[in-house]
Every structure is written in C-alpha cells, then in structure tokens.
C-alpha cells in the first residue's frame, strides 16, 4: 500500500509534523502497471503476494477499482510505503520492509501462475522482490513464462535485471540509472 501525507510546512525531523491530508491506495510497480492498463481500456490480472489486514484492504481497493487480481496470501502484514510531501514540494519516503517468503509461498505463486500461462499472454515482472528472495526463483519465474510461449516484460534493476536478461525477455524497461548500472557505466547528464 502507498500512503501519501501532506504537511503545510517543511518536514521537521525529530518533531511532531501534523498532516493536513492523508491518502491510501494500492501501490507497487506491478499494481501501477495494472492501473495503467485499466486506464487505457485494457484488462489485466495482478499476481503476487498479499498479507494480513493491509492485504485485504489492498484487494478490496483493487476490486472496487475493477482491477482483477489473484494474490497468494502469506503470513505477516503487507507493507506500507509512506510519502510525506511538504508545502514546498519536498518529498520524504519511508518504505517498510517486505515479508520474507518460504518455499511453499513461492510454489503457490507458481501454481497460481499456471492458470494464466496461455501462449501469447503478456507477463510483466516489475519492482523489487521480497527480502532474501533467491535469484534462482526469479530465474524460474522468467523461464516458466517463456517456456509457455508468453511474452515477458521486465522492469527491474541490479541482479534481478541481470538474471532476467539471461532469459531473453521480449522487452526491458530500465530507467537511465538501471541501464547504466547494468552495463557498468555512470549515467550522464546529456
């Protein structure tokens, strides 16, 4: 979940900052992909993990927005990423850690994916993975998608991007910093 809070003054670290507004919405790169597809008149199914009360809130919000989803419920609580915006437009972000997965959680995700692995379907793997998520599992996701004749789009960075490139995705969407990191260069201001 993404929480945006607005304050009327510059953020004062170590002091009470009262928000004048607060907004909660489903968040994460994958959810944003589904929202964009919906806004363009298409349909998608958001897959991934959900946890606890926050997970139920997210699923209810997605259902209300007519965004289809099929999440694997896991132990713990879905993380909330908080953004504080001050009157001058300054942004401060605080991102909670995600939940660790056990092997059975990952296997349940693979089983859930089986329902959607029809040739020609498009899968977007975007964002970060849960803490301590093995690269071999990310590779397995990529290979499973490609093996079934589905299109694979990657929006990742670092080791995840490197691992995904080995699976020959159909499209990769790195930003300038992710691309520079992938090729061992520094982004230029040009």
Give the positions of each predicted feature.
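Short acidic/histidine-rich motifs immediately flanking catalytic phosphotransfer sites
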Residues: 117-122, 168
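Positively charged, low-complexity intrinsically disordered leader regions
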Residues: 1-13
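Substrate-binding N-lobe of the ribokinase-like
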Residues: 18-78
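Short beta-strands and strand-loop turn motifs
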Residues: 93-95, 120-128, 155, 173-176
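Conserved phosphate/ATP/ADP-binding segment of small-molecule kinases
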Residues: 136-190
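Cofactor-binding loop segments of dinucleotide-utilizing enzymes, especially the Rossmann-like FAD-
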Residues: 1, 49-52, 74, 87, ...
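Conserved phosphate-binding/catalytic loop of the ribokinase/pfkB sugar-kinase fold
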Residues: 84-119
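Short, small-residue-enriched loops and turns at beta-alpha junctions
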Residues: 99-102, 129-133, 160-162, 181
């Amino acid at each position: 979940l993404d929480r945006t809070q607005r304050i009327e003054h510059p953020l004062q670290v170590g002091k009470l900052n009262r928000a004048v507004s607060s907004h909660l919405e489903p968040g994460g790169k994958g959810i944003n992909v589904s929202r964009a597809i919906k806004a363009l008149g298409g349909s998608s199914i958001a897959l991934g993990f959900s946890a606890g009360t926050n997970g139920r809130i997210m699923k209810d919000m997605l259902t209300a927005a007519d965004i289809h989803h099929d999440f694997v419920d896991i132990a713990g609580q879905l993380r909330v990423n908080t953004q504080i915006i001050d009157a001058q437009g300054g942004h401060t972000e605080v991102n909670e850690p995600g939940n660790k997965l056990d092997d059975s959680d990952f296997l349940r995700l693979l089983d859930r994916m089986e329902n959607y692995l029809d040739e020609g379907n498009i899968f977007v793997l975007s964002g970060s993975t849960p803490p301590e998520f093995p690269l071999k599992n990310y590779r397995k996701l990529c290979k499973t998608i490609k093996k079934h004749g589905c299109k694979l789009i990657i929006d990742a960075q670092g080791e995840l991007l490197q691992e995904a490139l080995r699976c020959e995705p159909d499209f990769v969407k790195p930003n300038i910093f992710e691309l520079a990191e992938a090729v061992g260069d520094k982004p230029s201001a040009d």
